[in-house]
From Swiss-Prot:
This is Ribosome maturation factor RimP. It holds the Pfam family DUF150_C. Required for maturation of 30S ribosomal subunits. Its main location: cytoplasm. One of its GO terms (biological process) is ribosomal small subunit assembly. HAMAP family: RimP (MF_01077). Keywords: Cytoplasm, Ribosome biogenesis. It comes from Campylobacter jejuni subsp. jejuni serotype O:2 (strain ATCC 700819 / NCTC 11168). One of its GO terms (cellular component) is cytosol. NCBIfam families: PRK14639.1 (NF011232). It is found in: Cytoplasm.
Length: 140
């Protein structure tokens, strides 16, 4: 099953997916984006496309709930493409060495991400594989 093609059919672009457990329930979440933003009708349309397909070819074992959503303003960055699409945005990063910092994404080149540290304004380049966790954030 090609989630990217199915999302495109609904006029959306696939961002990410995850399987989580909340209150003892398995939830399979699909995050999508669209120029101008994703609305409730977009999510419902994709859910209607996916539900009959998932009834035949389940993406997860056992019972689950399907959720279609926008990744939001403060979203997880788990692929190099996510960083490339987030140039100019603020990000909180935890490295594999458990170092934590906040920075602005300046550039992405292959597997390397150039960041400007928000504390000292120093520019640094980090390899994507050295990042354990990253999430965009908004300063209010």
């Amino acid at each position: 099953m090609n989630l990217e093609a199915l999302c495109k059919e609904a006029g959306l672009s696939f961002y990410d997916d995850e399987l989580v457990s909340e209150n003892g329930r398995k939830i399979y979440r699909i995050y999508v984006q669209k120029e101008g933003g994703v609305n409730l009708d977009d999510c419902a349309r994709l859910s209607e496309i996916l539900s009959p397909i998932f009834d035949v070819e389940s993406p997860v074992n056992g019972e689950y709930f399907l959720e279609v959503s926008s990744p939001g303003l403060e979203r997880k960055l788990s692929k190099i493409e996510h960083f490339a699409k987030s140039i100019g945005e603020l990000v909180k990063i935890t490295t594999n060495e458990k170092e934590k910092f906040e920075a602005k994404i300046i550039a992405v080149d292959d597997e390397n991400i150039t960041l400007e540290n928000l504390e000292n304004k120093e520019k640094t380049t980090i390899n994507f594989n050295d990042i354990k966790k990253a999430r965009t954030f908004v300063e209010w």
